[in-house]
Amino acid sequence: MKKTLLASSLAVGLGIVAGNAGHEAHASEADLNKASLAQMAQSNDQTLNQKPIEAGAYNYTFDYEGFTYHFESDGTHFAWNYHATGANGADMSAQAPATNNVAPSADQANQVQSQEVEAPQNAQTQQPQASTSNNSQVTATPTESKASEGSSVNVNDHLKQIAQRESGGNIHAVNPTSGAAGKYQFLQSTWDSVAPAKYKGVSPANAPESVQDAAAVKLYNTGGAGHWVTA
């Protein structure tokens, strides 16, 4: 767009599917309809969030019309993302919020900017609000930026809301299903694309709050809020 254009804005989501057997191949080795998959990803087709593109395990990466697309599954969970080809910044992907978060509110359930989600989700959570776009690259109306508590980084009000919805503001939160971690529930691949060099490869949950805030701001400014399910 782990929805790793980051399915959490975007750090690069996962869905639950049945089956264990599968294969791993580059897209060039597989009979994929690249044009169709690219169009579905660009339009945030909910089919990609509800089920894998095929049964079993797979790992496909391909370039199409200026973007790099990635689809993967281990036979149990599945994920997908895309980003501008050759871009070193954030990708457009999303992830499910950590399971130790507070229960979602009614207004959370209506807010979906998901590229990467834990499946299945009910019909209500698949409907975007009338005031938001269904495009994963949507950006929020500029809001006043203020340093968050425990951090000297200026974080705008929209990002603060995202952090509360993703982790309840817990910088050590970890989603045991998707592996998303930290205050903003970064997938590792997304985190590595925006984190400082010394924190690449380190779990976001182990980074200081100011580092997490700075990474989230970078992701938000380059990819918009579409990375986060709760944006």
UniProtKB/Swiss-Prot annotation:
Q: Which InterPro entries match?
A: Lysozyme-like_dom_sf (IPR023346), RPF (IPR010618)
Keywords from UniProt, A to Z, are: Glycosidase, Hydrolase, Secreted, Signal
**Mind telling me what this protein is named?**
Probable transglycosylase SceD
Q: What is its EC number?
A: 3.2.-.-
According to the lineage, what is the superkingdom?
Bacteria
Q: Does the keyword Ligase apply?
A: no
Q: Which Gene3D superfamilies match?
A: 1.10.530.10
The entry's localization annotation reads:
Secreted
Regions of compositional bias (Low complexity) in chain numbering: 119-137
- Residue ranges annotated as compositionally biased, kind Polar residues, are 96-116, 138-153
